[in-house]
C-alpha cells in the first residue's frame, strides 16, 4: 500500500462559515484530486431540490471557466435511495458558495484510493481448503450449488473477462476511471478469480461483473469509487438481483464520510459488501470504506491461522480470511500469487455468494451469517479485534 494511505489520524475540521455545511479536511500528506470535491446533500433533500441545485451549479460553470479553472464543473452525479450528491472540479469561491446552500450536508476533498495488495510470489494455494475445514485440511469442501444464480460485482482495476477461469460467466460492467476496458494491474482479475474462478474460486458458478474504478497504477479518486457503487446498485436493481448480489472492494484510503455513506447504501439496497481492512498494520477505523460499520470488513490471516503481519486490525474488522500467498487468475491467462487484505476480502465475498445460493439468504444478511459460521481460531489478532476466521459451514 502506497505511502499516502499510511496516515491514521484525520480531522473533520469545519472550514466554512457558521451554519454552512462542513468542508471536511483530509489527513496531512494524503493524495487528492487537484480542486476535486465531493458534495453530499442532506438526507431530506427532494429530487426537485436536488435538480434545482444542479441547475444552479451548471449556471456557475461558465464563471469558473472565466476564472481560468479549466475542466471545471460537475463530473459525476450520485442518486442513491438515501444519498444524493455529486463530484467535480471547483475553485475555492465556488466551494464556499456550495457549502452555504442549506440543502448541502457536507463537502469533502476527492482523495485518491488504492488497492490493498502488498506482494507477489510463487507458492501453492491454501485458502480454499482452509475456509471449508474447521481445523484445516487439504481439500476444498463445498455444496454443488456453488454460487449459482448470484452476481459478484468486482469494484476494482477491471477483470480479464475472457480468462478461462470464468468459463464465460464474467462480463464487463462499467469503466469509471479511464478508457481502457482491461485490467492494467492484475489485481481485479485475481480478486474475481478468488470469488468465482473454476479452479481458484469459492462460488464457482457465480457471475462476475467488472466495475473498473482503479487505473493501471492501482489508484482512483474517491468520487469514482462512489460512482462505481452507485452503478452497481442501479445495475443489480434493473435486473432484479439486489438481494442475490455481492459487491467486493479490495481497496481503501483515508477516511471519507462520503464513501462510507455510499457504501452503506449498497447494504440498505439489499447487497452483501466485503471490503479489505488495509495493509498498514494499524487500526482500520481511520480508513474508508473499511471503517463503515455496516459492511463486512475483512482482515488477512496466514496459513497457520495467525494475523498477517501487514494486516490492519481493530473493532471495525468483522472477520479474518486467508490473505497471504493466495493463488488466483492473472490477466491474459494463467495464474499468480498475491498477498494482502485485498486477497482476504474476496474470500468473504465468495463465501457470501455461496451461502446466498445454498441457503437462500438475502445479500445484506450474509455478513451476519458469515460471523455465525466463523471459527475463533486466529492467534494474536491485534488490539480489540475479533479472532473469528471465515468458514463456509460445509466441512468438518
From Swiss-Prot:
The active site is at 156 (charge relay system), 187 (charge relay system), 342 (charge relay system). Residues 37-113 form the Inhibitor I9 domain. Residues 377-389 have a biased composition (Polar residues). GO terms for biological process: proteolysis. Its EC number is 3.4.21.-. Its main location: secreted. The keyword Iron-sulfur does not apply. Pfam families: Inhibitor_I9 (PF05922), Peptidase_S8 (PF00082). One of its GO terms (cellular component) is extracellular region. Residues 377-396 are annotated as: Disordered. One of its GO terms (molecular function) is serine-type endopeptidase activity. Residues 1-20 form the signal peptide. It is found in: Secreted. Residues 21-116 form a propeptide. Glycans are attached at residues 63, 230, 248, 392. Residues 125-396 form the Peptidase S8 domain. It is an enzyme of class 3 (hydrolase). CDD domains: Peptidases_S8_PCSK9_ProteinaseK_like. Belongs to the peptidase S8 family. Secreted subtilisin-like serine protease with keratinolytic activity that contributes to pathogenicity. This is Subtilisin-like protease 5. It comes from Arthroderma benhamiae (Trichophyton mentagrophytes).
